[in-house]
Amino acid sequence: MAYSQGGGKKKVCYYYDGDIGNYYYGQGHPMKPHRIRMTHNLLLNYGLYRKMEIYRPHKATAEEMTKYHSDEYIKFLRSIRPDNMSEYSKQMQRFNVGEDCPVFDGLFEFCQLSTGGSVAGAVKLNRQQTDMAVNWAGGLHHAKKSEASGFCYVNDIVLAILELLKYHQRVLYIDIDIHHGDGVEEAFYTTDRVMTVSFHKYGEYFPGTGDLRDIGAGKGKYYAVNFPMRDGIDDESYGQIFKPIISKVMEMYQPSAVVLQCGADSLSGDRLGCFNLTVKGHAKCVEVAKTFNLPLLMLGGGGYTIRNVARCWTYETAVALDCEIPNELPYNDYFEYFGPDFKLHISPSNMTNQNTPEYMEKIKQRLFENLRMLPHAPGVQMQAIPEDAVHEDSGDEDGEDPDKRISIRASDKRIACDEEFSDSEDEGEGGRRNVADHKKGAKKARIEEDKKETEDKKTDVKEEDKSKDNSGEKTDPKGAKSEQLSNP
């Protein structure tokens, strides 16, 4: 059994595919998968690879993705390419693809790799073959059942949680991205088997959801926790509320597995963000999550000043490994990005922290009141365990011929010019609209339409589990809390 007892060093599995950095959202788009490659290269040069098991993720199949997403949406993602977009204009509108979420070469393969790492990490945790699994290419928390959103197409987090639910009665999801984790909250809004806890900027900011009063519905009432924050939050303010809230959640909910989305756009100086956290302040959340000694899946997310994303996720990998690394950056393939200081840690800016101690205390107390409404954590039900998404011999071992990798075949047309990897502020106006009402009307209409189309598919996880147990069939978690809810 892999689980470490107490505060000892944990076994860590890390998922990375060398092709991930070649995918390119387009000129001026703030989302740059290249940041994953920068992170990987930096942690290699720190020598962290010696302390963990590194796996190349399998490419998640369409069948795996439709455990949550609609068949027609995944079929669309498989089919659309830059050279056939004109044939899909109606579907592009329906599935919200084309602006914030552009069509680019290898889009579906990018989704397969991002999802493959998260699902494989969940399987590894389920098998008790690791204490922690890390997939920095995952954490794409805005994707909906039948809609792309906020640079996210396939919700790898929801799919990984569905995998964890095969073995774990209760899963806790924590989101420290600056943007509300709306796609994950929406997927599990009506079940008590997943608690979602999101700390995010709220008010005239994408995606416009995550109000303090959004607490879940039906069986899921009080199982959605939202901490709305204002501009400029710093390490001290964040630390004063994060640990108490997560400790109270652990006490009241008693999950047996945790998923932590480590979006790095909550760092100071992020191109799209407005918080003032340092890498150390951000990583404190990883330290807190680790202290509970539960199976932990760590995922990426947002982060648009890419030199700082690489710093952050490298340091958080070291924190996962209980490994101290020097502030002086080692020479690496992207060394020039980290000038002029060439240090691992960043300083906060002098921006005003609009989160007063009174405001933070008031929100914390309101959330504590909600958490006190939770019933005592339900006991574990005995039930047949469904088949794992990744078989022992399929995704984890590197059995593919490296000469047949996608990068050899097609990376030339996916590699961006050097200046596209810069962090300059004048890079273009592309990207996420940080306004709450951006296309809200159209979105609501689409969600209502999807609601009608998928009504028959929607059932509660537990009811489905019971019926499957009675019939002796394999449990299919599709439809687990997949209610499409309009933005508040």
From Swiss-Prot:
Covalent cross-link Glycyl lysine isopeptide (Lys-Gly) (interchain with G-Cter in SUMO2), where: 75, 439, 452, 458, 462, 478, 481
Q: Which InterPro entries match?
A: HDAC_PDAC, His_deacetylse, His_deacetylse_1, His_deacetylse_dom, His_deacetylse_dom_sf, Ureohydrolase_dom_sf
Region annotation Disordered: where it falls in the sequence: 389-488
Q: Might you name a Gene Ontology BP term for this protein? A: oligodendrocyte differentiation
Where are the annotated segments for Histone deacetylase? 9-322
Phosphoserine: modified positions? 394, 407, 422, 424
Q: How is the cofactor bound?
A: Binds 2 Ca(2+) ions per subunit.
The residues that the entry says bind Ca(2+) 2 are 188, 191, 194, 223
Binding residues for Zn(2+), per the UniProt record? 177, 179, 265
Subcellular locations according to the entry: Nucleus; Cytoplasm
Q: Where is the composition biased (Basic and acidic residues)?
A: 402-417, 429-481
What protein am I looking at? Histone deacetylase 2
